[in-house]
Structure formats: structure tokens, C-alpha cells
Regions:
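Catalytic cores of enzyme domains
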Residues: 132-134, 142, 148-215
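Glycine-rich phosphate/diphosphate-binding loops that line cofactor/substrate pockets in enzymes
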Residues: 33-48, 71-74
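Active-site histidine-anchored catalytic micro-motif
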Residues: 76-92, 123
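An acidic, phosphate/nucleotide-engaging active-site surface
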Residues: 93-157
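Short glycine-rich or small-residue beta-strand-to-loop segments that form or flank ligand, phosphate
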Residues: 46-55, 78-85
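Histidine-anchored nucleotide/phosphate-binding helix
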Residues: 57-77
Length: 215
């Protein structure tokens, strides 16, 4: 048998340079962002800060500042594991993932709460269910913290960010299961409609959106 090889096209090496906006003092910037939210925090509250499974640059510094800001209001910060089905959707799996990222009570000075039980809290007009982890009902206020970026699998007005953190992350295994059961064309609608349902039912104070540059 004769082997036929196709000639390779001509190639050239290139160098691509991306825009590189930077925040030189991460802690100072995070303190400034938290000042927008702290007027809504009352002494004695328990405030849940979401933590997820994605590796985000400088996330420990940002979480540390958020914990300090909440505590400075006379409130008690807790870290709510919010990663959908990651970590196998189990409490121990979630803890293992967070431990690997350095997100621990010892490092950040706030309890880390894992949970694998979800509750249906409502339904959208289009028949989508809003799920929420039981752990979210143990706090007086929720502040989602997440990176905002384009999604690798679908395009829409809302992709990866704070809405997805609420719908899929805090939605736990139930929210993640519904998300992954739908076609790509339906996912932006799910994120928008279910987020509206969650905001109407849960004490979400606001969120911190993180943007990373290409480096």
C-alpha cells in the first residue's frame, strides 16, 4: 500500500500582543469595591461570600479583604462553596477542591461551608426551576464573587459571571444538572430568567465581578 502525504502549507512564526490593563494594588481595589456593598450590611448579620472551583488570580487576597470588610461592619462572614457539580457534587469533594486552591478557614479567617443539598425555590414563566443550596438559607445576605468572561461552549448576552455563580454555583447539583441538560441556545435564557427568580427570593446584596487580562 502506498502512503500518500499531503504537503504542509507554508507557516510563519508570529507574536501576538494583547492589551494589558492592570490593577497594581489588588487589596486596595477590592476594599474600594466592597465599600459599595458594606452600607447594606448591618451589625449581627451573617454574610455569605461565594467561593468556587475555578483558579482566579489573586482570589485569596480579594477574599481576605472581603472577609475583613464584612467583619468591619459588625457582621459575621462565611464562605459558601458555590461550584455546582464540581467536586463530584459532594461536601467532601467541594472541600477538597477549595483546599487545593488555598481557600480555607485557616487562611481566610472565616468558616467554609460546603453543601450538597438543593432546594427548588421557584419556577420561571418558561418552566425553568430556580435551585438554591440549603447553605444559602443559613445567611442573612449573599455576595457572589466570580470572574466574568466569555463561556467556552455558548454565546449570549450573559455567559460566565455573577449570574452563573448564582444559578449554577449556588444552585448546586440541581442547578448544574438543569444547566447541562439544556441545549447551548437555551443557556443564556436560563441564566437570565433563573437569576431574576433568585434575586426575587434570596437576599443578594450585590456582587464583585472580577475581570482578568490575557496574561
Amino acid at each position: 500500500m502506498t502512503e500518500t502525504r499531503c504537503p504542509l502549507p507554508k507557516m510563519a512564526r508570529i507574536r501576538q500582543t494583547f492589551a494589558r490593563p492592570r490593577v497594581d494594588d489588588i487589596a486596595a481595589e477590592m476594599r474600594e469595591q466592597m465599600q459599595v456593598l458594606t452600607p447594606r450590611i448591618r451589625p449581627g448579620m451573617t454574610v455569605g461570600l461565594t467561593v468556587g472551583s475555578r483558579g482566579i488570580q489573586n482570589i485569596l487576597t480579594m477574599l481576605e479583604v472581603a472577609v475583613q470588610a464584612v467583619r468591619g461592619c459588625g457582621a459575621s462572614p462565611v464562605l459558601l462553596a458555590a461550584m455546582g457539580s464540581h467536586g463530584g457534587g459532594t461536601r467532601q469533594g467541594q472541600k477538597d477542591v477549595l483546599d487545593s486552591l488555598g481557600i480555607t478557614e485557616e487562611r481566610l479567617g472565616a468558616p467554609v461551608i460546603t453543601c450538597d443539598v438543593t432546594r427548588a425555590i421557584g419556577e420561571t414563566p418558561g418552566g425553568l426551576v430556580a435551585y438554591m443550596l440549603e447553605s444559602a438559607f443559613g445567611v442573612d445576605a449573599i455576595i457572589p464573587i466570580n470572574r466574568v468572561k466569555t463561556h467556552t461552549s455558548f454565546k449570549g448576552c450573559v455567559e460566565s459571571g455573577l449570574c452563573k455563580k448564582l444559578v449554577v454555583g449556588l444552585g448546586g447539583p440541581g442547578g448544574a444538572g438543569q444547566f447541562h441538560s439544556l441545549g447551548q441556545a437555551e443557556l443564556p435564557r436560563l441564566l437570565v430568567e433563573v437569576t431574576k427568580e433568585i434575586l426575587g427570593k434570596m437576599p443578594v446584596l450585590g456582587g464583585v465581578a472580577i475581570v482578568e487580562n490575557a496574561y
